[in-house]
Amino acid sequence: MSRKNRAPKREVLPDPLYNSKLVTRLINRVMLDGKRGTATSIVYGAFEQIKEATGTDALEVFETAMENIMPVLEVRARRVGGSNYQVPVEVRPERRTTLGLRWLVTIARLRGEHTMQDRLAKEIMDAANNTGAAVKKREDTHRMAEANRAFAHFRW
């Protein structure tokens, strides 16, 4: 792999049903072994369940959930004078979205419901209501950053 240039970021096309790039990124996150059709049916099925359960637009619920999951601060390890410090830093917008989607899908996979469609739908609804393990993950990340606030001056 060439180390000359950084690989350019490819543009993500919006999905055909909701016309949203965020939904496409969710589908890509859910996808395993290149099975996009399976991933698409899981995500769209979960959105149908959300629409039936809440009676509101599933995309709005999903966007609210993402806002509640995406972290604002995180800690990064920084070596200063022979010891490592956990330095709190702000999260870039692109990384916020990436972390939010990663946490959502990872935690949905660990849930106990029968199908991935059910797990994803329940986790998105929980996150939209500011409950659930994905929101707890964000709170833990923020708590860690707050606890290490004394090392903020090591930011680079």
Swiss-Prot record:
Gene Ontology MF annotations: rRNA binding; structural constituent of ribosome; tRNA binding
Keyword set includes Ribonucleoprotein: yes
Keyword Ribosomal protein belongs to the record: yes
Keywords: Ribonucleoprotein, Ribosomal protein, RNA-binding, rRNA-binding, tRNA-binding
Pfam assignment, any one: Ribosomal_S7
Gene Ontology biological process terms in this record: translation
GO cellular component: small ribosomal subunit
Protein family according to the UniProt entry: Belongs to the universal ribosomal protein uS7 family.
Annotated function: One of the primary rRNA binding proteins, it binds directly to 16S rRNA where it nucleates assembly of the head domain of the 30S subunit. Is located at the subunit interface close to the decoding center, probably blocks exit of the E-site tRNA.
Subunit note: Part of the 30S ribosomal subunit. Contacts proteins S9 and S11.
PANTHER family assigned: RIBOSOMAL PROTEIN S7 (PTHR11205)
Protein name in the entry: Small ribosomal subunit protein uS7
Organism: Streptococcus gordonii (strain Challis / ATCC 35105 / BCRC 15272 / CH1 / DL1 / V288)
GN (gene name): rpsG
